[in-house]
C-alpha cells in the first residue's frame, strides 16, 4: 500500500514508519524540514517537505495515496486548528473513497477511570478538550475511519515515563513524582503501538475507536521508583502545576486504568 504517514520522524511515528516499511509498504512522509526529510528517507520513507495544515498542498498528496495515518502534532499548542486543518484535507481527499484513514487521539479525552474501554464517556481535562470536536467531525464524514488512542507510551529511553527521571529531587536526593504519585498510568510500549497501527491500516474494514494499552497500569510512584531504583516522594499537585503548567500537570495527574 501507498501510505501517507504524518509525524514519521516523531517518537511514535518513527516506530510506525519502521513497522510499515518492514511490512513492505510504500510510505510517503510529509515533513516540516530538510533535516526531517533526511531522517525519514534514511528510515525508508519517501519524504516530501511541506505544510500539512495547508489543504492546497496536503489534499493532493492524500489523493495519490491508498491510506493515511496521522501522528503529527502541533508545536504551537494549537491542536484544534492543526488537527482541524488535517481533517479538512482528509475529508476532501478520502471522503466516499473507501480508503482507510487512521487518526490519533489519546486516553486523556476520557478523564479519570479505573476501567477504560472504547465506550468510556468523554470527560477530558482542559489540555485535550479540543479533541472531541475534531473527532466528531471525522466520525460524521463518509470516511473509513479508525481512531487509535495510545496510553502512556514508553520504550527506547523516551516517552512520558522517561521524563520522570528529569524531575527535581528533594533535599535527601529522592526523586519527586508528579502530583501525589498515587495516580495510575495505563502504559504501552511504543513498538506495540506501531504494530497496532500497521495491523489496523491493513484491515479490510475500519476498526473504529481502539485503545492502545498493555494491560499494565502502574502508579506514577511505582514508575518513579523503577527509574530511581529507590524511594520517591510526591511533588504535590500545586508544585506540579507550577513546574509543568496547569494544563499538562492536570493531564498527568489523571488516575486512569485500562486493559
Predicted regions and their residues:
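Conserved catalytic-site region of short-chain dehydrogenase/reductase
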Residues: 77, 107-114, 153-157
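Glycine/proline-rich active-site loop of Rossmann-fold NAD(P)-dependent oxidoreductases
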Residues: 154-165, 200-210
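N-terminal Rossmann NAD(P)H-binding glycine-rich loop of SDR-like oxidoreductase domains
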Residues: 3-25
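A conserved pocket-lining segment of Rossmann-fold NAD(P)-dependent short-chain dehydrogenase/reductase
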Residues: 166-188
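Mid/C-terminal beta-alpha module of Rossmann-like enzyme folds, strongest
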Residues: 2, 15, 194-245
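NAD(P)-cofactor binding segment of oxidoreductase domains
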Residues: 57, 61-102
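Conserved beta-loop-beta element that borders a ligand/cofactor-binding pocket
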Residues: 135-157
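Conserved Rossmann-fold NAD(P)-dependent oxidoreductase catalytic core, especially the SDR/UDP-sugar
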Residues: 28, 87-127
Amino acid at each position: 500500500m501507498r501510505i501517507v504517514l504524518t509525524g514519521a520522524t516523531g517518537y511514535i511515528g518513527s516506530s510506525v514508519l519502521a513497522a510499515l516499511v518492514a511490512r513492505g509498504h510504500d510510505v510517503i512522509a510529509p515533513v516540516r524540514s530538510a533535516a526531517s526529510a533526511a531522517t525519514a528517507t534514511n528510515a525508508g520513507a519517501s519524504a516530501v517537505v511541506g505544510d500539512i495544515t495547508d489543504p492546497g498542498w496536503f489534499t493532493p498528496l492524500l489523493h495519490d495515496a491508498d491510506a493515511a495515518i496521522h501522528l503529527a502534532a502541533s508545536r504551537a499548542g494549537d491542536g484544534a486548528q492543526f488537527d482541524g486543518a488535517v481533517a479538512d484535507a482528509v475529508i476532501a481527499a478520502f471522503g466516499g473513497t473507501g480508503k482507510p484513514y487512521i487518526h490519533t487521539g489519546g486516553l486523556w479525552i476520557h478523564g479519570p477511570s479505573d476501567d477504560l474501554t472504547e465506550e468510556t464517556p468523554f470527560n477530558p481535562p482542559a489540555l485535550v478538550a479540543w479533541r472531541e470536536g475534531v473527532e466528531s467531525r471525522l466520525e460524521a464524514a463518509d470516511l473509513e475511519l479508525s481512531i487509535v488512542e495510545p496510553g502512556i507510551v514508553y520504550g527506547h529511553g523516551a516517552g512520558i515515563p522517561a521524563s520522570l527521571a528529569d524531575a527535581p529531587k528533594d533535599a535527601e536526593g529522592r526523586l519527586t513524582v508528579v502530583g501525589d504519585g498515587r495516580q495510575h498510568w495505563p502504559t504501552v510500549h511504543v513498538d506495540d503501538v506501531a504494530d497496532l497501527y500497521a495491523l489496523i491500516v491493513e484491515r479490510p474494514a475500519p476498526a473504529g475507536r481502539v485503545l492502545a494499552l498493555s494491560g499494565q497500569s502502574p502508579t506514577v510512584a511505582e514508575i518513579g521508583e523503577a527509574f530511581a531504583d529507590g524511594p520517591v516522594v510526591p511533588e504535590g499537585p500545586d508544585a506540579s502545576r507550577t513546574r509543568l503548567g496547569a494544563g499538562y500537570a492536570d493531564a498527568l495527574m489523571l488516575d486512569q486504568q485500562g486493559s
